[in-house]
Amino acid sequence: MADTLMSDTPFWQRKTLDEMTDAEWESLCDGCGQCCLHKLMDEDTDEIYFTNVACRQLNIKTCQCRHYERRFEFEPDCIKLTRENLPDFEWLPMTCAYRLLAEGKPLPTWHPLQTGSKAAMHGERISVRHIAVKESEVRDWQDHILNKPSWAE
């Protein structure tokens, strides 16, 4: 009975982030694209400013990287979120599964692991699909700074 109960419980509810396989870890990403928006840092204060400017490799419509497996070849500054460096990324959105699980919180009901698709996430406007602009179309990056979210203060 206990084995059946364990298998019915989703992996993210029965494993810590450290216990997850690489495939499970990767599947936590909801594909919102928020990590793929450029951030600007104030040289004097190290304060991070969020923009709506998408990385060149982000397909804005699908919110997927065009070259995910080889992304560092195309974008050397692309982040690689790992179990070890997760605490360094304080700017991750409140909706990020990695952040939520690290804080002991549940996945949101719209998360693709809960629903089986990204439709609910896009419907909730969690993804950057509705706000992102192509890097090639930006003249002055400062014009694209978003209001800093309250959680990042």
Swiss-Prot record:
It holds the Pfam family CxxCxxCC. It comes from the Bacteria. InterPro entries: Puta_zinc/iron-chelating_dom, UCP006173. HAMAP family: UPF0260. Belongs to the UPF0260 family. This is UPF0260 protein YcgN. It comes from Salmonella typhi.
